[in-house]
């Protein structure tokens, strides 16, 4: 996935009201842009950190740009635009780059399922039946180690999705929790038990119920993203 237009570089002044960020562009222009991330963005929003943003040409838009990338304190690039994760996964699925999920005959997005009124990010159809996928975007790295973690904030919704996937797996339906790691320099993924122990517990229970837990790491550059390789998940 290449960015639709060249990204512009700047530095972060502050993030506030969840969806807003003030930045200063490389040319000294101060802008308020859209922050497309509802998480805590730990290690992605240090004051003064380098950021990259896409600028909109739509005159009807209230904000002139969207925050796309951050440089972490460890010098890694993180894609903070969580909407990119689903697009990146879909691109990889259609290209056959996720070997464990290859061979499907149809793909549907945002499919309702489960007793808790959830929506799967993707439903794939195979000659043998359906498969449901939940995608999570991972950008959290605590230190110099090459292990990323999820979530970066307590997520009741994420735990609900795991319960729904586990229920499918118990019925003999393939269910997948797929972590899209949009952080460079990562070699493995784990649940962030120190942030949300309930999520970590739900993930382990889902895996025991038969949910397939996969992680794929993206190559993150200022030109674009590419889901490059499978990463181990340390439960």
UniProtKB/Swiss-Prot annotation:
Disulfide-bond pairs as recorded: none
Source organism superkingdom: Bacteria
GO molecular function: DNA binding
Pfam families, A to Z: SfsA (PF03749), SfsA_N (PF17746)
Coiled coil: none
Cross-referenced InterPro entries: SfsA, SfsA_C, SfsA_N
Similarity comment: family membership: Belongs to the SfsA family.
Name this polypeptide is given: Sugar fermentation stimulation protein homolog
The gene coding this protein: sfsA
């Amino acid at each position: 996935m290449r960015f639709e237009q060249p990204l512009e570089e700047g530095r972060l002044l502050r993030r506030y009201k969840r969806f807003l960020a003030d930045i200063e562009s490389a040319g000294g222009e101060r802008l308020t842009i859209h922050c497309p991330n509802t998480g805590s963005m730990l290690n992605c929003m240090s004051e003064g950190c380098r950021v990259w943003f896409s600028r909109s040409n739509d005159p009807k838009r209230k904000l002139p740009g969207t925050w796309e990338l951050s440089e972490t304190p460890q010098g890694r690039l993180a894609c903070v635009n969580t909407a990119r994760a689903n697009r990146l996964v879909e691109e990889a699925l259609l290209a056959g780059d996720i070997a464990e999920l290859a061979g499907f005959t149809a793909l549907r997005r945002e499919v309702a399922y489960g007793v808790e009124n959830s929506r799967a990010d993707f439903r794939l159809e195979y000659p043998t039946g359906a498969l449901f996928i939940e995608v999570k975007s991972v950008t959290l790295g605590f230190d110099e180690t090459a292990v990323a973690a999820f979530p970066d904030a307590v997520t009741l919704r994420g735990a609900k999705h795991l319960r729904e996937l586990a229920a499918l797996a118990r019925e003999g339906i393939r269910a997948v929790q797929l972590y899209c790691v949009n952080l460079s320099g990562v070699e493995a993924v784990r649940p962030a038990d120190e942030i949300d122990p309930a999520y970590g517990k739900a993930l382990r229970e889902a895996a025991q119920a038969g949910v397939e837990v996969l992680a794929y790491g993206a190559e993150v550059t200022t030109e674009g993203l590419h889901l490059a390789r499978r990463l181990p998940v340390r439960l």
